[in-house]
Design a protein with these regions (language model features):
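Membrane-proximal basic amphipathic "stem/tether" segments
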Residues: 1-36
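Active-site and donor-binding regions of nucleotide-sugar-utilizing enzymes
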Residues: 31-166
Length: 166
């Protein structure tokens, strides 16, 4: 979550501009981008490792946005690119498939993109759209969001301003 009223305003305004730009850029059907800034862990690591074990790294180009790419030397000579947030704009705009885990990118996916927010748990507190102080912003920057169980769909729909079936 972006803290501070003005930082949030700049963040979401920039996201609107990038969302428009994204519609103009063709998507690569063989490109996958993981936005896991804090690192490959929990759900991001599980999905990433599954894709590696199943051989997706050959036919697909896989980009991982992490804080410290040097932590992942084992992927250096594979079909995986580890990169910082500063170098991630092009992969984010070109990828057909986007995966993130709560560290939202304020860019709306286009009709030619599939964006999955595999949220890391169930919120026990108010988050995003549930908090009045965060203002009237959209938080549904994904095509789908995962919930730990059907009982939590309503909570996610309220928090992210999305439909329960997303």
């Amino acid at each position: 979550m972006v803290k501070g009223k003005w930082k949030r305003k700049i963040y979401f305004t920039g996201g609107k501009v990038l969302s428009v730009l994204s519609r103009l850029i063709p998507k690569d059907p063989k490109r996958v981008c993981f936005f896991c800034k804090s690192g490959l862990d929990d759900n991001s690591e599980a999905l990433f490792r599954y894709m590696m074990e199943q051989g997706y790294a050959g036919p697909y180009r896989i980009d991982c946005v992490v804080d410290d790419p040097a932590q992942y030397p084992q992927w250096k000579n594979s079909h995986v690119s580890m990169m910082t947030v500063r170098k991630s704009l092009w992969p984010l705009l070109r990828s057909r498939y986007l995966f993130c885990h709560g560290e939202m990118v304020a860019i709306m996916p286009t009709k030619k993109q599939v964006s999955v927010n595999y949220w890391h748990g169930t919120p026990l507190k108010k988050i995003n759209g549930m908090m009045e102080k965060l203002g009237d912003y959209r938080y549904d920057f994904f095509t789908y969001i995962t919930a730990a169980a059907p009982a939590f769909r309503k909570i996610f729909a309220e928090a992210f301003g999305c439909r329960e079936e997303q």
